[in-house]
Amino acid sequence: MKRNTIDIITLGCSKNLVDSEKLMRQLEANGYKVTHDSDKPQGEIAVINTCGFIGDAKEESINMILEFCQAKEEGKLKKLYVMGCLSERYLKELALEIPQVDKFYGKFNWNELLADLGKAYKSEFAIERTLTTPHHYAYLKISEGCARKCSYCAIPIITGRHISRPMEEIIDEVKLLVSEGVKEFQIIAQELTYYGVDLYKSQKLPELIERIANVPGVEWIRLHYAYPAHFPEELFRVMREHDNVCKYMDIALQHISDNMLNKMRRHVSKAETYELIEKFRREVPGIHLRTTLMVGHPGETEEDFEELKEFVKKVRFDRMGAFAYSEEEGTFAAKEYEDSISHEVKQQRLDELMALQQEIAGELSQTKIGKEFKVIIDRKEGDYYIGRTQFDSPEVDPEVLIKADEEYLKIGEFYKVKITAADDFDLYASIL
């Protein structure tokens, strides 16, 4: 047990990771040594930043809390604090059920946590953070909360209304990160396309991305978690005109059947969805689309599911994730619909959909053999350097593997490669 050391454990999404990184910087500014995501307690104090999005995430968070409670009982830890989405939503219940935790905090109560440690929040470090990612890329969160009211989603209940960060503050953070060696930015929010509506009374995502693209030293910008309804089409021009805005869009579509889109309260139709995809591919040639789909939402019939499969076959997404509906208390779906689709049927549909996507992904990967791409090197792993193209986001997308015995490559640098082989997800390449 190291004195004056705090372990930060982050669960859930990249937005949570940014929160942890900002907290880490505050703790370091207050004199602590901070470790991140260690397998076992190293310091006197641990802070677990939880996720509470769906059932599996809640279970993972609870298990991690209990694991650290055990470590505390064994004398390996003096203090245990819990924050984040799960804690925000179930603070009172958790405090009663798990008294071994010294204190539970909401998602945004950093000041309180620091005060309990006898420290103070330092506003001069507000846009600074301690990166936990490789030094060449960072996640850039442009807003908090969500203004949408999708039937199944508890995020607005947990995080509250959409709050855009001021544009100047974001640009200052980008410049600071570039000065520290960051070249690649993953732009994230619960819902990107709403950015600016609350603060500037209109959608400002295209303007923001263009301003980030114009910052010297920004080499790649990638956009995550867009919403299909009222998509700001000015963004197409920005993507076309700026080479450092990756031809990549992560847009959660959830379903295609009008029956399900209505039940999900998505405020977009099947026809509008197809039209938007067509516009993406027409206006931004070569764009790679990532989406997330949901199966098993209350009311999903076999016909709805077949329609979803046909959609996946027809559109042939470059990247796709999917998950099964999980009832979340307090949501519209939990109040108004019966969760009548069995776990077995949900899992069967999920497996079927992902098997279909795996086949499509494999076919799309094969078309890249013989082509040349610019890649950034993330790490060395065994006999390979691991890199990504502009079409691949860290953690969730395919990677490019380059034999390490070819030549010495620098982590965080760009190289031109030629694809020599492919499997269902990853590509193999040689340096040009």
What are these regions (language model features)?
Residues 333-432:
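Terminal RNA-binding accessory module
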Residues 79-84, 89, 94, 179-303, ...:
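Conserved SAM/AdoMet-binding glycine-rich loop
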Residues 111, 148, 193, 258-259, ...:
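Glycine-centered loop/turn positions within well-structured domains
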Residues 170, 187, 223, 251, ...:
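Conserved, mostly hydrophobic/aromatic
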Residues 6, 45-46, 138, 185, ...:
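Conserved beta-strand core positions
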Residues 189, 225, 253-255, 291-295, ...:
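Active-site proximal loops enriched in glycine and acidic residues that flank catalytic Cys/His/Asp
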Residues 1-195, 234, 249, 271-282, ...:
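Proteins enriched for Cys/Gly/acidic motifs involved in redox and nucleic-acid/cofactor modification
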